């Protein structure tokens, strides 16, 4: 396994989580959604496995699910997080927890 790719995935993931957490508008989150897409493409290519049950022969890494969940949960509850800026979006917390767990390297 490429340790540089792992370090990059962690650093990019933490940076992305911070950006999602700081986003205050749907426009910002829409822009971040594209960043999430680019990040998950990298994660899937570097660390993904081919799903035997998928019709497509593509690699998939479970960390991708958590990245999309982070931006979607923040978007779905944006009004709440604007009123409560001291709280980290729960989807972002879950993404960071899974990122730090390293379970996605299996």
What annotation goes with each model-predicted range?
Residues 34, 39-51, 60:
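Amphipathic, interaction-prone secondary-structure segments
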Residues 62-106:
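Amphipathic alpha-helical binding modules
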């Amino acid at each position: 396994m490429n340790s540089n790719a792992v370090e990059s995935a962690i650093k990019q993931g933490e940076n992305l989580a911070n950006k999602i957490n700081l986003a205050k508008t749907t426009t910002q989150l829409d822009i971040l959604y594209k960043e999430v897409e680019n990040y998950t493409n990298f994660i899937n290519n570097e660390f993904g496995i081919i799903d035997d049950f998928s019709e497509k022969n593509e690699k998939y890494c479970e960390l991708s699910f958590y990245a999309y969940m982070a931006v979607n949960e923040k978007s779905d509850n944006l009004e709440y997080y604007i009123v409560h800026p001291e709280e980290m979006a729960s989807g972002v917390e879950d993404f960071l927890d899974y990122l730090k767990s390293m379970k996605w390297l299996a």
